[in-house]
């Protein structure tokens, strides 16, 4: 993990881009502090509740990357906002700014980042008139300052061919040109232009306007990302696997299958299946909430065909997770293995379940 943090920080610094890693991946203040120590300009969180955990732990700058749109959420923002740390909020609607105006105390100041969407269709505004209206209102209210803009094209991150991924990412940034022209016409500077991610970390550094990248999964990697091709290979090789889930072999219901005690409650199942690097010839199949089954590929359709799986009952196996972010949210803590290969302690996943 430390090597991944260092590699990303060095890469971004070499291209004169800021390092604003996303804590929705790890949900752990200890890891966030390590990222800040490596030169991060701040930490991203997906939700206000995650931001509360990070600010309470002493993180000095937090950007909430999902839009605020209700007064209840704005009240939560007001509760954590202070002049002792920088709190940046994403807004993409008049409704969201209305909520913040109604709830933020007069003696507090928060930065507003306008979320822009040109291709993904998840969050972000597209209309120029709404963009300008929000910009004007931000400048009129002393509790707010215009911090910049955000553009995240998450649907591009896992495009499997590097050149296709590169083409679509660059095109998505090109479509923001009109927004930058509007800012220039108003004489407004966007100090922050934030976005990008692990899948485009080596592409988006070439974007002139971009100030920092919101990389998240790079810190752990997962099987979904490992299957995405890199610039010069069919596997994503820029960062090492730094997160595994340990499962125990608990049963052998037939000669060609071994059951482990990790299922839907241990791994996020929205993507590919877990992979045991130590047994690459075996395939994992989910077998319910609490279990998974390892099989040889040729035994999947004919379970009686193969023996000699190389696993004994009681063996502890480590699996690369399918999708790191939601898998982390299933667990309470990280067991931390040091360079000597031994586990010397644990780190609480303090923002687990912070989904509001």
Give the location of each predicted region.
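Active-site loop/helix belt of alpha/beta enzymes
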Residues: 111, 117-231
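Active-site-proximal beta-alpha core segment in soluble small-molecule metabolic enzymes
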Residues: 22-158
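A generic structural signal for well-ordered alpha-helical segments
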Residues: 12-14, 35, 139, 183
């Amino acid at each position: 993990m430390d090597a991944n943090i260092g590699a990303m920080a060095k890469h971004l610094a070499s291209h004169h881009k800021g390092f604003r890693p996303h804590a929705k991946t790890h949900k752990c203040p200890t890891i966030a502090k390590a990222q800040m120590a490596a030169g991060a300009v701040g930490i991203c969180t997906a939700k206000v509740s995650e931001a509360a955990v990070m600010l309470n732990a002493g993180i000095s700058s937090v950007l909430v990357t999902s839009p605020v749109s209700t007064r209840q959420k704005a009240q939560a923002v007001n509760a954590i906002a202070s002049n002792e740390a920088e709190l940046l909020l994403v807004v993409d609607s008049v409704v969201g700014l209305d909520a913040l105006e109604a709830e933020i105390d007069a003696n507090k100041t928060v930065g507003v980042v306008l979320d822009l969407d040109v291709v993904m269709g998840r969050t972000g505004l597209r209309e120029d008139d709404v963009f300008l209206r929000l910009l004007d209102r931000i400048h009129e209210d002393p509790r707010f300052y215009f911090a910049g803009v955000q553009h995240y094209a998450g649907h591009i991150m896992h495009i499997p061919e590097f050149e296709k991924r590169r083409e679509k990412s660059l095109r998505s940034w090109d479509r923001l040109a009109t927004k930058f022209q509007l800012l220039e016409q108003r004489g407004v500077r966007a100090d922050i232009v934030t976005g990008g991610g692990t899948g485009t970390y080596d592409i988006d550094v070439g974007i002139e306007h971009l100030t920092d990248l919101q990389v998240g999964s790079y810190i752990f990697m997962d099987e979904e990302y490992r299957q995405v091709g890199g610039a010069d290979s069919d596997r994503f090789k820029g960062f090492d696997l730094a997160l595994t889930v340990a499962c125990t072999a608990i049963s052998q219901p037939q000669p060609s299958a071994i059951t482990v005690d990790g299922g839907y409650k241990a791994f996020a199942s929205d993507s590919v299946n877990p992979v045991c690097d130590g047994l690459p010839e075996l395939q994992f199949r989910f077998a319910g909430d609490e279990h998974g089954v390892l099989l040889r590929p040729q035994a999947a359709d004919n379970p009686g065909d193969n023996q000699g799986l190389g696993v004994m009952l009681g063996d502890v196996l480590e699996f690369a997770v399918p999708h790191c972010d939601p898998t982390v949210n299933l667990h309470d803590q990280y067991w931390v293995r040091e360079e000597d290969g031994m586990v010397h302690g644990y780190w609480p996943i303090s923002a687990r379940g912070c989904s509001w």
